[in-house]
Amino acid sequence: MDYKERLIQEQKELKEKCEKLQIMLDKYISGTLDFTPNCSYDLLHEQYIYMMNYLSVLSYRIKMEVK
């Protein structure tokens, strides 16, 4: 697998993780999580923001690198 394929794979995996974290955050707010997190909503939300920013950068890189 070359670096372009790895970029695309990383983007796919990160997108899935972002989607799952968003679902978790929605459940956290609505009080429907099936477990009690040890960290705050704010910390998880901050993680989500950083992950989404990284996804944006990664997507831009892919547009530039993969043609």
What positions do the PLM features span?
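Extended, charge-rich alpha-helical interface modules
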Residues: M1-K67
